[in-house]
Structure formats: C-alpha cells, structure tokens
A protein has these predicted regions:
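N-terminal domain-onset segments
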Residues: 1-60
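Acidic, proline/glycine-rich low-complexity IDRs
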Residues: 91-131
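Acidic, low-complexity, intrinsically disordered interaction modules
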Residues: 36-108
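Generic structural motif
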Residues: 11, 72-74, 131
Length: 131
C-alpha cells in the first residue's frame, strides 16, 4: 500500500477493539457513501479517502473503498479517528444486463505513521534513444 492521503495530526486516537464494536453496527452491504450507524445518539460514518477503480478479472470485477471512521454530533462538529474501514466489493454481470454485488465483511484497521527513509539510486548506465 502506498499510503493514504490523510493528515494524521488531525486524527483522534480510538482503541481498535472499540472501533470494531462500532463498525459491527454498520450494514456492510450499504453503499460505501452510506456506511454508518447511530449508537447511543452518536452518529458514526466514514470519510472516504481511497477508492480503487473496478478491476476486471473476466466474470468478476473487484473494487475496494477505504474511509476514516468519523463521529458527527448534532452541532455539526466532526471528529475523525485513526481508524480505517475498508469495504471490499465483488460484482458479476454486465452493463447490458444487471450487476450482482457481493460484499466482504468490513475490515477495520488502526492507522499509524510510517517514516520512509530517503533512498538514493546508485549510478548506473542505461540505453536510450539518441537525441
């Protein structure tokens, strides 16, 4: 994975087990933009940060969508947590008939920062077109 386009400093910490309990209330067959649940008067949802294109493998096509777990309060404030929720979608059928969608259980992961060390490419000789 290349990394998510997320400002890690803006995220609040949440325990992974607590996040899994919250996400267990989500209906994994909802459209990814509608994933969420209201628990004890608190609305939880996702801020989508990564969406793949459909990967066509013949009979089946695959797609995954990842969002950051968010808590929305009635006053309009939103708290984003260091939790990523990924929905894996499989579809069969075609544009001309209709698609049948299947959804894997939602994957819940803790987000962390990872430092990538600077890499220096060693000198080498390559062959190119003459100018």
């Amino acid at each position: 994975m290349e990394g998510l386009n997320v400002n890690f400093e803006e995220l609040e910490h949440m325990d992974l087990e607590e996040a899994k309990k919250i996400v267990s209330h989500f209906n994994n067959e909802d459209d990814y933009e509608e994933l969420g649940a209201t628990i004890d008067g608190i609305e939880y949802g996702l801020d989508i940060v990564d969406e793949s294109n459909w990967d066509d493998q013949g009979k089946y096509q695959y797609k995954d969508v990842t969002g950051i777990l968010c808590e929305s309060l009635e006053d309009g404030s939103v708290t984003k947590y260091d939790i990523a929720v990924t929905q894996y979608i499989t579809r069969s059928g075609s544009y001309f008939t209709s698609y049948n969608y299947e959804y894997d259980p939602l994957q819940v992961d803790q987000l962390v920062q990872k430092v990538i060390p600077q890499q220096i490419i060693p000198e080498r000789t390559i062959v190119v077109f003459a100018e």
